[in-house]
């Protein structure tokens, strides 16, 4: 754990990990073995990092991000699995629309089926 890094409560750091200087690991972060966390990286609450992953210097992972692969330096990622923040935000916005979209697709499928029956 590098000089100046802050480790909050209930953080688990696996074997053979390296946490750079001035990194911040917020509550309930879990880091699997052999990971590299760059200097000044921020892992918000409940972030989970798979084994042998590298988090670049200054990268930010928002709360509850699931990290299966390397994160480039200086980027902000979120989601499960994690992805660049702009993409994660679009997915989160679309999730709210899914119930209405499913209803609409079902209605359209019924109408299409009815039209195909009439045509036959």
Predicted regions and their residues:
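Structural signal for interior beta-strand "rungs" in well-ordered beta-sheet cores
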Residues: 1-84
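Long, leucine- and charge-enriched amphipathic alpha-helices
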Residues: 83-120
């Amino acid at each position: 754990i590098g000089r100046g890094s802050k480790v909050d409560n209930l953080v688990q750091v696996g074997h053979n990990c390296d946490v750079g200087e001035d990194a911040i690991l917020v509550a309930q972060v879990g880091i699997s073995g052999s990971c590299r966390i760059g200097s000044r990286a921020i892992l918000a609450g409940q972030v989970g990092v798979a084994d042998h992953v590298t988090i670049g210097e200054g990268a930010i992972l928002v709360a509850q991000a699931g990290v299966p692969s390397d994160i480039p330096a200086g980027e902000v990622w979120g989601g499960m699995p994690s992805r660049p923040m702009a993409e994660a935000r679009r997915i989160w916005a679309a999730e709210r629309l899914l119930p209405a979209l499913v209803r609409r697709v079902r209605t359209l499928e019924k109408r299409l089926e009815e039209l195909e029956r009439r045509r036959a």
